[in-house]
Structure formats: structure tokens, C-alpha cells
Amino acid sequence: MEHIYQYAWIIPFLPLPVPLLIGAGLLFFPTATKNLRRIWAFSSISLLSIVMIFSMKLAIQQINSNSIYQYLWSWTINNDFSLEFGYLMDPLTSIMSMLITTVAILVLIYSDNYMSHDQGYLRFFAYMSFFNTSMLGLVTSSNLIQIYIFWELVGMCSYLLIGFWFTRPIAANACQKAFVTNRVGDFGLLLGILGLYWITGSFEFRDLFEIFNNLIKNNEVNSLFCILCAFLLFAGAVAKSAQFPLHVWLPDAMEGPTPISALIHAATMVAAGIFLVARLLPLFVVIPYIMYVISFIGIITVLLGATLALAQKDIKRSLAYYTMSQLGYMMLALGMGSYRTALFHLITHAYSKALLFLASGSLIHSMGTIVGYSPDKSQNMVLMGGLTKHVPITKTSFLIGTLSLCGIPPLACFWSKDEILNDSWVYSPIFAIIAYFTAGLTAFYMFRIYLLTFEGHLNFFCKNYSGKKSSSFYSISLWGKKELKTINQKISLLNLLTMNNKERASFFSKKPYEINVKLTKLLRSFITITYFENKNISLYPYESDNTMLFPLIILIMFTLFVGFIGIPFNQEGMDLDILTKWLTPSINLLHSNSENFVDWYEFVINAIFSISIAFFGIFIAFFFYKPIYSSLKNFDLINSFDKRGQKRILGDNIITIIYNWSANRGYIDAFYSTFLIKGIRSLSELVSFFDRRIIDGIPNGFGVTSFFVGEGIKYVGGGRISSYLFWYLLYVSIFLFIFTFT
């Protein structure tokens, strides 16, 4: 079967003809290309399906034979330098290829209907196809140079798609923010690659790992320099996977179309950082300090993402912060050395998160029939509510995805998340406590999203939620309050830390008041939606078309069953752990003397604890967000909380602190804006002044002085010989006078 591997080089290039042909068609035959636009969507899906089938065949071959195949072409060779390009087919490559293709195919099918009203339909599919090509090229790369090339292409495509509606200033700003933030990590990655080449003299993974490990083992290289290079490599993953402190671009990236949000969060851009750390893990494991840094950054991101999600009203931003938190779990697992567990959670999270984002896109699409094109309203959860009877299939999809991400068995994320939580006890009890606490917090805010969206009544016709906003740069808490606009204010460090809201937070909604229902027209005439304004406007949302529902149903099946590939049981006559066989040999620092299998009793005891925490978070969410007419509302219990006196005041203060922290994004964006952005701008203005006034001023001063001296001499001479003779005799007389008397 080795001949199968010989043709694996076509994997990244099969989707490439679509963007090339779309570009050529729009250049030479624009009318025909636009009229036949759905053919290009069909071509994108068909070519990607071929890649998926080929990847599956390679994966089956690797499961059966545990083979690794690498093919290289020499690009340049001389005495001191050699550079080769090729492809590497190993378990990590096959897993990522299958993950990318399956999710991307479903997203493309979904996008055909979701983007049908957009004049940028062809541009969207061209970007998406090139995005898939770049990501497939990244995961099949055999050396760091190829990794970096495709790494930059993945970033470029993501910027294009985040700023897809570039005529909206908010989307353009989000694109710039993603670009600038990722520049920091990408520059670190480039420096790390160059540093490793200086140490090892190779870019190829196999040679690099072997040489680097030998140098470290024999103490033949400066350890501080090795730590620095490894940290710079990790910095690239921190930015790409939205880890603290370079996470600030991810929530704003939701300004792009919802299908690309699903693809970015499930299987492409943010997964690229996890893939890079997994690929370079043999290099990181020989440097314990870097492993500590990876796990520490991971656990901070886990907690930070969960707390920042609490006060969001925008459904896509809430899911974005959840993605950030789950990526932190994966990074924590890699830092602990649980290679298999991290990849397992990457797989299960990808399908569950794609399901949630596509379901949220269906909701946004349906809400658009009421509010028109207005992201401030169509994505606002507190304007939703009571959608169960209007969008039952979407509701079921969202509920299954929510239960999976909360860690409820037997759904996919339960199996992988539970393994990470168990491994965290072995690694660090403090990290384990934070991880378990965040698991409960995750269940709370995920069910908050579900209850605000689907339970109760449609709140768009009520006034008790502040739904009208001037821009999308706001975050509204679960209590329906505006976030302070701190970014454009002049604030000091003291004000930054003591930032507060003037209104008082409350868990409970106020009495609803009816408002005058008026469906506004499109607020932004420059948006490329042609006839959405005048058609399909109704008083209530309705279920999406079958083209959008089909991917949801397929993702439900993945969410239900994909977790079973990694069940860690190995009893008599039963060998269910396909993932471990697939990843053989793999790295596991926490269980180096075991076979990664546990018995039923140990598994059940650990699972009961994590499930109990998840159900506790769900119960708290139901307690606060279940509709007021629900039988689950215990008003005696609620009133008992309202009569606590001093304890009530303390509780309200704690709630306000949590709200302010979450609504202001942990003050991190404000800190960057105040001290970094303004500081850099002030420094650049100072440098510009020094350059223009000092550096350029010196030669300009000499030039101006010479000009005026020459002009003065010209007017003094006047062009007459008698004047020249007079001045000549005058200067000679003065010279003789001075010489005589000195």
C-alpha cells in the first residue's frame, strides 16, 4: 500500500484550482462566472470530498500498520546549506486532514444557502477554498520552512474572511486587530525557527528532534538560548490559538460571516496553534521549563476565557470565549505531556463547536427575518428567547452541542474533557482545582446562552432588555447592561483598575413594558445583501432551509459518536481505544509506565465527580435564567436571597465586580489600548519629530544657510568690476592692518 503515500502530495493542492479559476473567471468572464456561481460551490465541495476520502484511506492504513511516510524534494544543496520540500504522513497529519476536510465540507454546504443573498458569494468560496488548501498544506509539511509558509497563508486567509464585509468599519478594524496581534506571535515563530536552525543546522523535523535532543542530553549547547528559541516557537502558537495574553483578536473575529467563524474555531486557524505545539512536542519535552510555561499559559486561558464569557450578549462572542477556554484545556494537556488527550479533545471539540456555530448561524439567519440585517440585534441573545417552537431542529442541534461541551455523557466532549481533568490531578492539584471549577463555570454560561436564546418569550418585542446599541463594540452582561466604552477614553491606571458601572447589576429582569414594534430598514446600505431587506420579513423567526439543516444533522451524528474512538477501556475481549492505536507511538509523560487504559470502576468514580460539577453549573443557570413562569422557579428561595441584609449587599458587590471584569474583557483590551497602543503611537510621533526636525533638520539647515550666504554674496557683488576691486582692496587693507598691529 506504499503507493498510496506516493500520491499524498495532492492533498493540499486539490482545492487550489477553485480560487484560481474563480479569480481568472471574474477577470476575463465576469458575467458568466457570476451567473454560474453555484458550480464553483459544487466544485469546492467535490474536490474537498476527494481529499477527505483519500485522507480516510491513509488513516485506515496507518491504524493497521502504524506506518509513517515522508517524501522530500531537494530545493537547493551546497556545502553549507540545504533546503528540501516534501510532505510527511503520520498519525497527526491524517487526524488533522480528516478533521479539516469533514468540517470544511459541511461548512461549505451550509454556506451555499447562508451566503446566497450576498454579492460576495464567489469571493467567499474562493477564500474558503484557499483557506482549506493552506491548512492542509500546513498539516502535511515536513519541515519548519514549509510550516511557516503555510502558517502565514492560513493567517492571510483568516484576515480576508474576518474582514469579508470590509465596508463595515467594525469588520475592517477586527481584521486589523487580528493581523497586528498575530504579527507578534508570527515574528516570534520566525525567530524561533532561525534560532533552531542555528543550533541544529536542519529544518527537517526528524533531524531537528534527534540533533536537538542529543545536544541537550550531552549539554553541548547553551540551555538559556534553547529555552529562548523554544519559547519563541511557542509564542506563534499562543497568538494563533488565542491564548493569554494574545487572545484579544478572537472575539472581534466574529465580525466575519458565521460559517467562517465555525471553520476558524473548529478546524483551521485556532487549531493550527495546537497542531504546532503537538508537532514540536518532542522538542519541548526535553526542556521542562517550556512545558511548565505551556501548561501555565493553558490554565490561565482556561479560567480567563470562562470568566470573560459571563457578561456577553452577542451569541457569537460568547461562543468565541468558550473556544478560547477549550483551547486552553488542549494547551494544558500538551503542557502536561498528555499528547493523546490533547488531540482527542481537539477532535471532539471541533465537531461540537462547529455544530454550535452553525446552529447559531441558523438562529442569526432566522432573526434576520425580524430585524433585517443588523448584527447588533440579530446576534443579541437577550432579544431572542422562546425560539424552541419556531426553530425546533436548530434548538435540538444547539442543545446537543451545549450538552457535549458541558461534558455530559455519552456525548463527544465528555470523554476527552474528563481525561484532561483526571490528568490534571496527577500533574498539579492547583491546576486541577482551577480546571474543575472552570468546567462548572462552563456548564453555567453555556446553559445561560441556551436559556436566553430558546426559553421564555421572544424578547425583541419587550423593553426590559437594552437591545439598542450604537455599535458592535460592546459587551452586555447576563443582567442586560451596557459595557463602559473604555477604549477611546483617556484613563489612568487607577481608573483602569477601578472601572465600574453606574447602574446596579441584578440577576433578575425588570417588569417588561411593551414597545412600539417597528421593523427598521437596513441600517447600512453598503452591505452586500441585495434583496434581503424586502423579502422574508415576518413577525417571528422560522426554521432555516434544508441546505443549512443537513450539516447540523451530520454534526449531531459526529457529536454523538466521535467520542467513542478514544474510550480508554481495555477489558478482556474488548479493545475500544482506536485513537491510541492510531497514535502509536505517542508521547505520554504522565502515564509513561502504563498503556493509557483504566478500568471501569476508576473511570466511573472520576466521571461522577466531573458530571456532578457540570450539573451543578447547569442547575445554577436554570435557577437564574429559567423563564419566570417555569415550575423550576422557586420564588421562596429567591426571596430568601433578597432578604439577606448585609450579606445581600456583599453579594451584589461581588456580582458587580464579576460583571465589570467580564463586561470590560478583563480590562486587558483597555490596558493594551491605554499603555501599548497609545504608548507606541506617542513613541512613533516622537521618533517622527526627531527624524524630521533633527536628522533631516541638520542637512536642511546647512542647505538653507548656504543658500542665504550665496544670495548675500551675489547681491553684494552686483556683477560690476569696480565693486569687486573695492571689496578686494578693503579686505587686503584690513588684513595688513591686523597683521601690522599684532
UniProtKB/Swiss-Prot annotation:
Its EC number is 7.1.1.-. One of its GO terms (cellular component) is chloroplast thylakoid membrane. The chain crosses the membrane at residues 9-29, 39-59, 91-111, 125-145, 147-167, 185-205, 224-244, 258-278, 280-300, 327-347, 354-374, 396-416, 425-445, 549-569, 603-623, 721-741. It is found in: Plastid, Chloroplast thylakoid membrane. Pfam families: Proton_antipo_C, Proton_antipo_M, Proton_antipo_N. It is a multi-pass membrane protein. Keywords: Chloroplast, Membrane, NAD, NADP, Plastid, Plastoquinone, Quinone, Thylakoid, Translocase, Transmembrane, Transmembrane helix, Transport. GO terms for biological process: ATP synthesis coupled electron transport; electron transport coupled proton transport. One of its GO terms (molecular function) is quinone binding. It comes from the Eukaryota. It catalyses: a plastoquinone + NADH + (n+1) H(+)(in) = a plastoquinol + NAD(+) + n H(+)(out); a plastoquinone + NADPH + (n+1) H(+)(in) = a plastoquinol + NADP(+) + n H(+)(out). Belongs to the complex I subunit 5 family. NCBIfam families: NDH_I_L, PRK06590.1. NDH shuttles electrons from NAD(P)H:plastoquinone, via FMN and iron-sulfur (Fe-S) centers, to quinones in the photosynthetic chain and possibly in a chloroplast respiratory chain. The immediate electron acceptor for the enzyme in this species is believed to be plastoquinone. Couples the redox reaction to proton translocation, and thus conserves the redox energy in a proton gradient. NDH is composed of at least 16 different subunits, 5 of which are encoded in the nucleus. This is NAD(P)H-quinone oxidoreductase subunit 5, chloroplastic. It comes from Spinacia oleracea.
